[in-house]
């Protein structure tokens, strides 16, 4: 297998609005990130992915961009960005930009022009259609509830927005749009950024006839309906030729709705398109087929089957990304394990062991390395996320699919705002994130869970992440070894091996609060511990795995 620096990297995702406020306005900013470079270096990560920092009206927290070559005023200036980039590079950390080019803001100059008239030179930068029988052109739904079409009175036509109505979709079939995007990407690469995380990149190519899809719980087809369209690979290969080959970059595509076969095309090892993709099949294990708003618990057997499918399916063909969390997902320790005081630390360490020991590039979302948890929201007024607020309005107030109590329960479990509360730096007011009340509430458990408390505690979740990250840098087998699942039918234990030549590792993770008896394969019984989240017990044929225990044995 060919060795690459991006396969050996550990990526840390920063959601700038919630990371560190340096100027006392309650909003995180670029200078706050610069301030914390030593913390990131201490953790051991070597790539930072920044959620969008471009100029934006902030309808969807920066994923609605009005100027790709300017910095959001709340986050600082371009000089602040340059200073942060230089500081990152001084600390041995590469910077990856969030590239949002499926859509722009409706306040972007291209769209302002596009909606003026049917013959405007920018009209074809976006996707406009006539209505059908007095309604939308098709039954596609927006990711954020309601239809994916907005009627525009100025020209009497509808424009497509797979996300909010303030995020009109770009028309990638127009070569001028592609040239504009590629030119902008080259501009950022010349500035010195090291790569791109590509937002919903699997959606950029729509089928020309825009066919109806299967309706979901709210009567609309999924926003994923256009995923993996007819020209998506052609456009990404063009991007590779005109942009990505100009620098030694890391690229990861967010590919909602991607299949294993499609992923092989996006992230083949011949590097004609992307280095890797984010797939979300494992994130859907605790959702219903047409509805994520549920408090359904994860079935570990299904989770193992999905992760194993991706581990084995991409082996020697493409590269996996490894993650439990990001800015769109709730906190993993609350979602998949036990965030109670009794089991919080071992749970967070177990989840980290399970995902970091697989083949692929691991992604750590800010606060995950502390075991930050979901938030005990009590009112819809505490939410800031468009997705959550719109879903509550649509499913409770308009369609009466759920009661207010049910929906609050689902939001507390699944809302994106669980990941977006301020980073918990210390136990001072507002968790040391800001000197004033932040843009969104602080999780009340910040006095127990914070960076200051953990950084100097050798037994903390933070220092366990440091060990895992150091091991990955030290041992090639963790990066390049092949993966094989054991005990597929166990409802509590996730056990797998990694193999590279004569070397072999055994990874054992208990996803339950039960003690579970497990037989250790013979070849590991005379082995040694590589890492463990409990005091190490004697290695023998039959071992009792303690609640949320995780360990790795080396042959």
Task: Please give the residue ranges for each predicted region.
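Active-site and adjacent substrate-binding regions of carbohydrate-active enzymes
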Residues: 1-528, 532-555
């Amino acid at each position: 297998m060919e060795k690459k620096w991006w396969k050996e990297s550990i990526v840390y995702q920063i959601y700038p609005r919630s990371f560190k406020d340096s100027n006392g306005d309650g909003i995180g900013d670029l200078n706050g990130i610069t301030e914390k470079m030593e913390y990131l270096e201490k953790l051991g990560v070597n790539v930072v992915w920044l959620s969008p920092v471009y100029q934006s009206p902030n309808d969807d927290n920066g994923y609605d961009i009005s100027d790709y070559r300017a910095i959001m005023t709340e986050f600082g200036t371009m000089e602040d960005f340059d200073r942060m980039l230089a500081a990152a590079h001084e600390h041995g950390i590469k910077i990856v930009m969030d590239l949002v080019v499926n859509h722009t803001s409706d306040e972007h100059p291209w769209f302002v022009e596009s909606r003026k008239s049917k013959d405007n030179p920018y009209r074809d930068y976006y996707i406009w259609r006539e209505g059908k029988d007095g309604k939308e052109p098709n039954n596609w739904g927006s990711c954020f509830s309601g239809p994916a079409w907005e009627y525009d009175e100025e020209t009497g036509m509808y424009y497509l927005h797979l996300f909010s109505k303030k995020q009109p979709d770009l028309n990638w079939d127009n070569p001028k749009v592609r040239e504009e995007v590629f030119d902008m990407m080259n501009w950022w690469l010349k500035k010195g950024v090291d790569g791109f995380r590509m937002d919903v990149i699997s959606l950029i190519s729509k089928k020309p006839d825009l066919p109806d899809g299967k309706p979901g719980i709210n009567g609309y087809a999924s926003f994923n309906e256009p995923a993996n369209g007819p020209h998506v690979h052609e456009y990404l290969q063009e991007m590779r030729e005109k942009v990505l080959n100009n620098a030694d970059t890391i690229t990861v595509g967010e590919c909602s709705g991607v299949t294993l076969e499609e992923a092989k095309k996006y992230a083949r090892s011949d590097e004609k398109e992307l280095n890797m993709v984010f797939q979300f099949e494992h994130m859907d294990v605790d959702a219903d087929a047409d509805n994520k708003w549920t408090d359904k618990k994860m079935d570990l057997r299904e989770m193992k089957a999905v992760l194993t499918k991706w581990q084995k399916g991409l082996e020697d063909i493409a590269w996996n990304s490894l993650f439990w969390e990001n800015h769109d997902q709730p906190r993993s320790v609350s979602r998949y394990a036990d965030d109670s005081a009794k089991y919080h630390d071992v749970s967070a360490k177990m989840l980290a062991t399970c995902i970091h020991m697989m083949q692929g590039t691991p992604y750590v979302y800010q606060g995950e390395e502390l075991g930050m948890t979901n938030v005990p929201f009590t009112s819809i007024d505490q939410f800031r996320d468009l997705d959550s607020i719109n879903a509550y309005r649509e499913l409770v107030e308009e369609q009466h699919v759920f009661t207010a109590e049910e929906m609050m329960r689902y939001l507390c479990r699944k809302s994106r705002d669980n990941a977006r509360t301020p980073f918990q730096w210390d136990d001072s007011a507002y968790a040391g994130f800001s000197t004033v009340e932040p843009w969104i509430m602080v999780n009340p458990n910040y006095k127990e869970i914070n960076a200051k408390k953990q950084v100097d505690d050798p037994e903390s979740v933070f220092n366990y992440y440091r060990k895992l990250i150091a091991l990955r840098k030290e041992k090639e087998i963790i990066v390049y070894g092949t993966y094989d699942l054991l005990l597929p039918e166990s409802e509590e234990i996730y056990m797998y091996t990694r193999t590279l030549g004569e070397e072999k590792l055994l990874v054992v993770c208990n996803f339950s609060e039960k003690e579970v008896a497990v037989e250790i394969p013979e070849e590991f019984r005379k082995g040694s511990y590589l890492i463990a989240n409990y005091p190490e017990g004697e290695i023998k044929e039959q071992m009792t795995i303690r609640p949320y225990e995780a360990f790795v044995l080396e042959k």
